[in-house]
């Protein structure tokens, strides 16, 4: 990949005799920060030294801390640091800074050959206007996968005949979860309705947005920062029937901060979450002081709706280049293109379950021959993630005003209600009601309609 002479800009305006400094702010921590800093050092001692570019990188803590610091700089607040040349950002933050006139459009700096190297859906995330602009440079992405406590799954599968193929669709997943609840309930015949949940989800907004896309509906249709809402009644009812309903019945659950926490406590044995969460999957189930056992992990592609369209979520922050001198923008691109070349991008990405962003790098063969130490378990995770990227349309909503708050409604409206209503069902059963009596009001059409209208009204506030 050519590193000098970005796109149509022939004279970069920097050299060893006329050097340029580039500042980068990230939210990276731990191993990811160490990997990034090591690559920055490598760049500075090689390509940077040859071309007169010095990159200075600093971590600003969490994603929220970084967002706050960037906004303070953009607004010129007292005590704020000068704007960096590059910062890590998700689309909504990048859009807010773009509205303030702070973001460089990189489309003029990238040739057709440059663009063709990247997975197209990753580049389009930063095209806020739909005009072909590039205001977010992709650096590392993750995919959603289905993670299983393989040890306890094998006991269940041996007893019931359940297979991994049963988990390929969302409808199949719900059916398996029902069988798991009934199988565990039957183990204590003297105690009715004490079956255990099978499944949970880490990111409900992803389920709502991607599930709707699979069903032919784009909930947030954004253009030029304005959103048109398509909260299709039938599609949303399907989403409800395949999350809220099994949750009320005890087949799904969510109690810890993350679903990997629920696997650790034995609350569930499967969840859909980011490929980058693989490193947090527990190696033991510790249900209580008297019940603990070692487990292994299985990673599969995330289930999709039967007969639905092939959509999967694309997620992971990119790098945003701020407006500056032409030399600084071009130098920023030299670093970012070097960083996303397969050799370096694979080094940065794979240890933490992230994926390279180019067609060449996003190949399990390229990852395997990279020379990096890759455990069998991480190989399985990355194989499933690479297949997800290569076999689906990748989707994330375009940024729009209030997008973060609108997404939060999708994240919590159904899941919070499911948790509260399941708790009410359990309390009613503890008071002597049958499950049918305790759950009747929650499994009614009227319950869905009331929630649907409330959620629709909340989302309509973000239209236009």
Question: Where in this protein do the model-derived segments appear?
Answer:
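Short, polar/charged alpha-helical segment
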Residues: 30-54, 95
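Extracytoplasmic "Venus flytrap"/periplasmic binding protein-like
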Residues: 48-121, 155-156, 269-270, 288-291
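Hinge/lid segment of periplasmic solute-binding proteins
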Residues: 88-145, 189-191, 292-303
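Short, solvent-exposed loop/beta-turn-alpha elements that line the ligand-binding surface or hinge
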Residues: 107-118, 162-166, 191-192, 197-199, ...
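Extracytoplasmic/periplasmic solute-binding protein
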Residues: 129-144, 171-228
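Glycine-centered hinge/linker elements that transmit conformational signals in sensory
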Residues: 174-181, 222-256, 298, 302
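Conserved C-terminal helix/tail region of periplasmic/extracytoplasmic solute-binding proteins
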Residues: 383-464
């Amino acid at each position: 990949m050519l590193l000098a002479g970005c796109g149509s800009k022939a004279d970069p305006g920097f050299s060893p005799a006329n050097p340029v400094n580039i500042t980068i702010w990230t939210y990276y921590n731990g191993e990811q920060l160490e990997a990034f800093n090591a690559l920055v050092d490598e760049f500075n001692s090689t390509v940077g030294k040859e071309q007169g570019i010095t990159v200075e990188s600093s971590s600003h803590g969490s994603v929220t801390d970084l967002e706050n610091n960037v906004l303070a700089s953009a607004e010129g607040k007292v005590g704020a640091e000068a704007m960096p040349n590059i910062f890590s950002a998700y689309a909504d933050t990048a859009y807010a800074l773009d509205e303030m006139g702070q973001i460089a459009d990189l489309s003029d700096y990238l040739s057709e050959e440059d663009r063709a190297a990247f997975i197209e859906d990753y580049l389009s995330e930063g095209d806020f206007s739909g005009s072909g602009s590039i205001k977010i440079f992709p650096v590392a992405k993750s995919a959603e996968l289905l993670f299983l406590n393989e040890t306890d799954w094998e006991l269940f599968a041996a007893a019931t005949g359940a297979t991994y193929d049963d988990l390929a669709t969302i409808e199949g997943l719900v059916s398996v979860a029902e069988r798991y609840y009934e199988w565990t309930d039957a183990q204590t015949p003297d105690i009715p309705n004490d079956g255990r949940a099978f499944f949970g989800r880490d990111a409900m907004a992803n389920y709502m947005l991607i599930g709707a896309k699979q069903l032919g509906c784009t909930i947030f249709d954004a253009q030029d920062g304005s959103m048109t809402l398509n909260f299709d009644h039938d599609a949303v009812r399907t989403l409800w029937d395949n999350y809220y309903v099994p949750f009320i019945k005890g087949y799904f659950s969510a109690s810890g901060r993350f679903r990997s926490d629920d696997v650790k406590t034995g609350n569930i044995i499967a969840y859909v979450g980011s490929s980058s969460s693989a490193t947090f999957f527990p190696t033991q189930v510790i249900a209580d002081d008297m019940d603990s056992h070692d487990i292994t992990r299985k990673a599969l592609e995330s289930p999709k709706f039967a007969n639905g369209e092939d959509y999967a979520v694309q997620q992971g922050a990119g790098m945003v280049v701020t407006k500056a001198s032409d030399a600084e923008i071009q130098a920023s691109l030299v670093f970012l293109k070097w960083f996303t070349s397969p050799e370096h991008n694979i080094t940065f990405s794979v240890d933490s379950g992230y994926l390279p962003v180019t067609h060449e790098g996003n190949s399990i063969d390229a990852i395997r021959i990279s020379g990096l130490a890759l455990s069998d378990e991480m190989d399985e995770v990355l194989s499933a993630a690479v297949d997800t990227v290569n076999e689906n349309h990748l989707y994330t909503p375009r940024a729009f005003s209030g997008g973060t708050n609108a997404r939060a409604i999708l994240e919590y409206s159904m899941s919070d209600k499911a948790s509260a209503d399941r708790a009410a069902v359990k309390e009613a059963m503890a008071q002597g009601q049958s499950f049918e009596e305790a759950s009747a009001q929650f499994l009614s059409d009227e319950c869905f309609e009331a929630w649907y209208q409330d959620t629709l009204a909340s989302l309509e506030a973000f239209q236009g």
